[in-house]
Amino acid sequence: MKKIIALILTLAAVFSLAACGSSSAPAAATEAPAAAEATEAPAAEPVEITVGATAVPHAEILEQVKDALAEEGYTLNIVIYDDYVLPNQALAEGTLDANYFQHRPYLNSYNESNGTDLVSAAVIHYEPFGIYGNGVSSISEVPEGATIIIPADDSNGTRALLLLQQEGLIELPEDASLEKGVTVLDIVDDHGYNVQAVQADTVAAQLKNSDEGTIAVINGNYALQAGYSVAKDALATENTDSEAAETYANVVAVRAGEENSEKIQALVKALQSDAVKQFITETYDGSVVALF
């Protein structure tokens, strides 16, 4: 009888151990996938950078840095504008992370007029102002009484008038300067020319539709859009080493305090690359000059 009881106890112990072993095996099996999952972290989503720009040359230059930014984990969205007001408005309102279309004097003028606090994050390029003519091949051929079309806004208007004075077409006060600014009303002697100030983005179109003999002072980017070449078509231009070149360098603008953010610094680094400088040099034939 004792042997039977001992045998029963032994068998019970064996089954008990087997049960413990079988219950622990699935636990190990269910833990394994969890460990594997822990090593497979989801890929980070690309960080978006939204930049407003005028089409030529700014948006074209921005297109050149999309791949470089993608390699750094950024997706570049380019919003194209055809005027000088909306890109700053959108930036101030937070729709854009940055814009790239303007120079510092225009940016400063916009801030003063609109109570905004937008700043330059980097200098990228310069677009020489040029004098272009309808049926005129040199400054000396500009006929008496000809119409001269210039941009109307303060900063671009000043620049245009100083270039006209440089070429002897008008006379301005002795203290006329980029810093002080001048308007059509400040012209001391127009030498019989009819100087008309119009919205900057319409100057080129108005020249194309004007009477023969008309000339116009056109912003570099609008000249490009209209098919003009500084090297081939301009009757006169600003020098690339002039005060105008330094003053009117085109900048990447951002909201104050964001110029050193990671994505803005990534954007600036990409734009100030050797590849972009080469693109500018080879593409724009002197109409756009890299300043980095």
Language-model-derived ranges and their functions:
Residues 121-170:
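A conserved helix-loop-strand patch within extracytoplasmic ligand-binding domains
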Residues 45-56, 74-80, 147-148:
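Short, well-ordered beta-strand elements
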Residues 128-140, 247-261:
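A bilobed periplasmic-binding-protein/Venus flytrap-type ligand-binding module shared by bacterial periplasmic
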Residues 109-121, 136, 226-239:
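Ligand-binding "clamshell"
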